[in-house]
């Protein structure tokens, strides 16, 4: 059977099991086997219109149940994310919720402004829940954008997202959000806007469609160094690709700002917004390009940090990725898989970030991004956050390197950075990355044991 058909069947099966879990949770509670086995109960919670949640909590609450962890992603279905059960089995109360955006992935209707209001519902729910004294946000992947933007605005007010440095200002409706007591960014990426930038195909000719590509800028052209078993691009190609990518990014922003001015003056196609389709602009993982094919890019940290091993030990060292090449197929010609289907306003507030002429990235650094030009940027957002911060990276995936960037920008006096050896972006063990079977052990357990220790450290959130 064709590999894509098999993958589609597996994804359908995973979604079926996820929703069966939620239905069981609503009906009476589920306690699957986890790294820790304290029994839990789960309760469906309607936080708002189109904003479902499931509260996971120990059946016999202990001291750690005073901490309520709130989990929400920028667009994905997180009602059964591993944090829901792994942390509740370790004694914490965990509210896992979905925002009100569509979960099909075809259109990107989940504007950051709206999902921030959805997140406010979750924080408010935990704030009034009996027995919860502290609320800690957990952002994974694109959830790092949502949770860091939320906490920055909640601590500092909307003035932090209405300054002249922002591409567009946030609305006043985001004022007055209740702040959390802590923030965990566990394999957050660089932000929705930066991931759109990193996924933008500079080979696309024109902006009317994705079927015509410039072969000299195509990462999937073998003449440029592409190899499905592992690509190696020349320094010249990398420079040309990144320069063209940054140029197209800024051109898209300028064009969208021009359309916004027309819309605001009453001359748009609609009075409130306009549809916008960007060919080769889909930001999801299968479209992340260049560094996903060439593992020498974004391959190690600049400084030494704790690396967590399967046996519970840690070593402070330069952190190298163990990932393998991914993304061997171009989706630029596909509307559903390769294009960003959004609106002018949503693009500018959620997916746009400015870059300078020297935009680039190499083995250990990203250069030339104005992290403060948008509130869709964890590195920019953490500059205003004062509560305790935990940031972690999974070395079996490229997004792990964002953890160092976020940590270096963080204002928090109490901030922690650690990396999990051999974990995928979803915290599971990267078996394809192992040189010997079992080399990395149970990385889910390694990850959540560390999170548990950070949350329950005396004096941080617990007396």
Spans of model-derived segments:
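N-terminal cap/lid segment of alpha/beta-hydrolase-fold proteins
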Residues: 36-64, 436-441
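Short beta-strand element of the alpha/beta-hydrolase
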Residues: 64-74
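Conserved alpha/beta-hydrolase
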Residues: 88-106
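Alpha/beta-hydrolase active-site loop
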Residues: 109-130, 145, 149, 162
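Alpha/beta-hydrolase
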Residues: 219-380
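Short beta-strand/loop motif that positions the catalytic acidic residue
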Residues: 385, 391-393
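Catalytic histidine neighborhood in serine/cysteine hydrolases
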Residues: 411-431
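Catalytic active-site module of serine/aspartate enzymes centered on a nucleophile-bearing elbow/loop
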Residues: 423, 431-463
